[in-house]
Amino acid sequence: MLLAPAVLLVVLGVTPAPPRFDDQGRALGAPLSERTASYVLEARLDPAARRLEGRALLTWTNRSEVPQRVLWFHAYWNAFRDAKSTFAREQAWGGTPRESVAGFREADRGWTELTSARLADGTELLSTLRWEHPDDANADDRTVFTLTLPTAVAPHGTLTLELRWEARVPRLASRSGVFRGFYFLGQWFPKIGVLEVPPQRGVRSPTWNCHQAHASTEYYADFGNYDVTLTLPRSMTVGATGVRTGRTENADGTVSHRFHQDDVIDFAWTAWDGFLEVERTFRAAGLPEVQLVALVPRSDRASAEQLLDATAVMLEYGGRHWFPYPYPQVTVVAPPVGAGASAGGMEYPTLFTGDVRAHPLEPRDMVLWDVAMHEAGHFWWQGMVASNEFEEAWLDEGIDTWGSGRAAESARLRWNLANLAPVGLRAALGPFFHSEISEEDARMLVRSTRFQTPVALPGWQFPDAASTGRSTYGRAVASLGTLEQVLGEERFARLVRTYAERFAFRHPGTDDFLAVTAEVGGAGARSLAERLFRGTAGIDDAVRSIHCGQESGEGLDGPWRCDVDVERRGDLPLPCPVAIRFDDGTELTEQVPAEGVTWQRFTYRRAGAAGRVREARVHPGGPVPLDADPVNDARSREATPGPVAMVAGWFLHAAQLVASAVGALL
């Protein structure tokens, strides 16, 4: 006899948790979020002209106690309008690794033009549109605008507004646009900003948070329900945020695809006539079922299977360590060859973009897995905890990089240098390059030295794109690892879980993370975290020298004196244990005070040559993740750092730069 799916799962010992949404993307039970900004969106794409016509019915609630007459909106695609936008200027000046808008030809450019803005009673607001520049004095920027209402929205009142717009799809850049018929459209509709209310993220009065499009920042938006209808040529396969709820064939050769999802902060979509669609169901005991869909180029099914494997690992890890992923679907998009650098490695609610590999290594190609797990991890920090990525990107990028690294380590994933062999020679040369580097060891390459800027800084205030990447990825991960080392893995895991559960769907800030740190780890842990994320403190504890000699001429069996000098070159107040090992095999551990000293000498007097100090090592339990130079952590009596250590140090520095550059792409 055939068993029903739910019965079969019980027989197999896999009992899923009850779903939070139905198969139409609608919440079952109480809303997960406040649903401040909800949209009914309709869009028609004309690929021949690269034109998009759209209509949005926005329902917005004034969460504050103050009437609101002026509404703030984003028009992100105007970043691609010309070389005068703030986005384009920052790209040209700061060296952003994405394709430069300043180098776009006229045919490459994209834009958004609002054609109508009407209230429910028909009142037209377009004449009140004003371009705003909250972050700089660039009067040529057109990425933020305001509309002024004839009557203010009362406290906790609701407004319905119809927006119509036309847009030109830009050449693919910074995760939006078109490349040889492949469309990926993020931030594609006029989107209302976030009205922050006390005590949210420390604001003292209701304040609009609606920043311009910047080259080194991502996004911030309120939660809401999205019901979206996309009309495109019949030949194109479509993937999007949420669940597909309808498909209508039209007489003009187009198809209207309808999607819905409650309680999300955004909606992104992709369309291409070259997609292969691969489906699977994620099932794990105690977690809700999730339908997984991979959209990959037709020749890359092997990549699709690995992308779905990696997504499933991340869904289970996040569900067990933070809180269960509640949505019914995940869509994984792998752009075609040539589009990955501009569209790959980006996260949206229920959807992310990954990568494909010709002939990926089996069973796990870490180039595929690492990006997929990182992007799937964003579902929690960017998508559901939903911190402000304009101003505090580390709360997403840093925590996600740390968390997805932990997930990879728990799954015993290993980096294999065979991944880097040329495509045509990978199978033949792979065995000669075979290596296994744990995720824990790989993360050590993301060390970051002391910087002139803190981690918790608005993205456009960093000196350049490289500094943004080093801080929000490298230094943030190293700082989290340092805090974890001080608190211990179990307590730090409890800190992260408490933060995730308490602030899911609530837009927390750095102050909220620090408050949970104090709650779980105590006042001392909060003080340390404050310096890690809001300061520029660094650490470079080192064994400076070991010197042994005889104070009297009594021969080798006479008394020996050994001095071990330990130097504290940083200003981060961490305990500094020192392990001392002697020639006779005995060991002892000393302590250098966390504060108040820059160096300390330990002196030992022992009889006989076997009593001499052989080796000394600071932090014997493992290097501090934020250590600027772990090469100098240990020294033996008979060796100095020498050329080998110097080369290792330079390699580590180069690895930091590579890790930061890669981080900026994720």
Model segments located where?
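Beta-strand-rich binding/interaction modules
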Residues: 239-240, 526, 539-542, 546-621
